[in-house]
A protein has these predicted regions:
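Conserved beta-strand segments of alpha/beta enzyme cores
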Residues: 62-64, 156
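Well-ordered alpha-helical segments embedded in enzymatic catalytic cores
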Residues: 51, 84-89
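N-terminal amphipathic/basic leader segments beginning at the initiator methionine
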Residues: 1-58
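Flexible, glycine/charged-enriched surface loops at secondary-structure junctions
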Residues: 186-194
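Short, glycine/charge-rich beta-strand/loop segments that flank catalytic centers
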Residues: 68-73, 104-106, 144, 193-194
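Charged, often glycine-rich, active-site loop that binds/positions anionic groups
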Residues: 65-86
Length: 194
């Protein structure tokens, strides 16, 4: 049976001291691509989606794209914008089920009104949808946080190594390589905090 993977992007870098709030228009002005409409050129947090296209095609896998949304760094995301984008992605994931894995492009330093850890919230919902036996992985910026919610929901993640972040394509390729090795049973990644 052909393996099936869902991918999506939801990212920004929040500065909690900034008075400039991010609403839905902030994402639409920077990057908002509906499923299957992301350009071929990868962006900082969307490289897993674009690199995954060739990865899946080469292996004969089905690559189901969800929304890709990025807002330029600013202050808090308003609650309505975060929840609407989160729910859009979750609805797309539900429609794509069953899947063998979820591959995400995240930043890791988002904060929204009412959510200190939006990525942890998103990942928790994703894990609830896919269950414990589906691989969930993501790329992160090195400025990201690693909360307990993220540790519990992720099978593994890869963070950018370079500053400036010129290695986002290579890190997406690393993520997909680890996914390959996990699917083959060669590795069993785990995430921990010490």
């Amino acid at each position: 049976m052909t393996k099936r993977f869902f991918t999506a992007v939801l990212a920004t870098e929040s500065n909690t001291f900034s008075p400039i709030a991010i609403d839905r228009r902030g994402f639409e002005a920077s990057l908002y691509a509906k499923p299957g409409k992301h350009p071929e050129t990868p962006t900082l947090c969307s490289a897993p989606l674009t690199e995954g296209r060739a990865w899946a095609k080469k292996r004969g896998y089905e690559w189901v794209e969800g929304t890709a949304a990025w807002a330029d760094p600013a202050g808090l995301i308003n609650r309505e914008a975060y929840e609407s984008l989160r729910d859009e992605i979750l609805d797309q994931l539900r429609a794509a089920m069953p899947v063998d894995g979820v591959v995400l492009g995240l930043h890791g330093a988002m904060v929204a009104n009412g959510y200190d850890d939006p990525e942890g919230d998103l990942l928790t919902h994703i894990r609830e949808i896919v269950g414990p036996n589906v691989i969930v992985c993501a790329t992160f910026d090195p400025h990201s946080q690693l909360s307990q919610k993220r540790v519990e929901a992720l099978d593994f993640f890869v963070a950018f190594k370079e500053f400036p972040h010129i290695d986002f394509v290579e890190r997406a390729q690393d993520l997909l390589h680890i996914l390959d090795e996990t699917l083959a049973g060669n590795v069993k990644p785990s995430v921990s905090v010490f």
